């Protein structure tokens, strides 16, 4: 069942979204060669807790951290580690969920480490474009499949693949709520959007084959062929005449709002 949020609930989610954005601002300063993914998560946890939030990822099915930090061929759910140290040219995704007074916001950014090559630059550009091409359609009365198809077409027309096993999702009191939102679909299908729905839209794309593998830790998801991956996500609320993205940094708002 899709839970429609009240104005008060959305305000609390926006507070959580502001904290997620602050995490990106602070952690962006650490995105450079020689920094471990453990250090990035430690800074994120410091920001989340200092802002009066909790990080619901930590302890979720025994997951050990508040964030996922995934590098290059790791698509999602990279466990922060002292052993994973950033290098020049890497792509690093930081997936953050903050819970403020019982309500969540969820977003992911992929960062370029130092000078990156054309492959990294292009997959990041396409991943972001896929998100915005899909989200730009959101308004009351459309089908969720309209958004999914736009994301899929953007990704595949540029020569990439969308991950099939993992999806976006509804969000609110729960970190994961209905509906499930695959990054593929057909326009005119799926739930009809209404004002007050809150959705985590998150293209997860692969440079090579769509196949993935999960490591023995039970979490880390990698491209099976070892090629680059990219992940971009925001929490989006359906409003009267369209949508509002509630997890943007102030700099991002200048670009997208």
Regions found by a protein language model. Name each.
Residues 1-257:
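Active-site neighborhoods and metal-handling regions in enzymes and metal-associated proteins
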